[in-house]
Amino acid sequence: MAEADAVPLHYTVTQAQEVPSWDSCEFLDLWFTGMEGARLYAKFLRPRRSEPMPLVLQFHGYPGASRSFAEQASFAGMGMALIAMDCPGQAGYSEDVGGFLGTTVSGHIIAGLDGLPERMYYVRLHQNIRILCRLVRELDGIDTSRVFVNGGSQGGGLGLACAALNPELIDRAAILYPIFERFQARVGPWRGRDRL
């Protein structure tokens, strides 16, 4: 994670191109720079309110992309912000700069297997999620003591890794049928573990 922590934070938050915002909710496009200069995308929605709000980081299943803003609007109705990142090369907007030969539509679990371990697809993806977590700390209006992760399938595995690798940020996790979660890491205790 030290390599990801050394990447300078560059991000933009703009009005979503897909849908207009509502009186009660903002729909935003969040673009940020990840490992190796990758351009990464996440849907960002939040209720229009002045006090700091909790945030859900949501990760999608494999292969796929983040759900539509309309499907996610209920989070704003509950008073929560949501950031749903598109995993690179899996049907969303995030850019895959891995330089791997062959398809980037499937086969991500083995992408980079014949090279250096730190260049494997999922190593880079976990590092990009770490960069996203650093970025979250800078966003206005987010209560960083109430940041949660949510995901199913691949997204469940990413959510577990996100919680384990960012224990000072992630308070709780709602995980469904995780896959790709068995990556070894040296991490400390997760502060939300005793509440599960």
PLM region spans:
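Cap/lid segment of the alpha/beta-hydrolase catalytic domain
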Residues: 67, 73-74, 81-127
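Short beta-strand element of the alpha/beta-hydrolase
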Residues: 42, 46, 52-62, 82
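Gly/Ala-rich beta-loop-alpha elbow adjacent to hydrolase catalytic centers
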Residues: 151-159
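N-terminal cap/lid segment of alpha/beta-hydrolase-fold proteins
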Residues: 10-50
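Hydrolase active-site cap/lid region
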Residues: 158-196
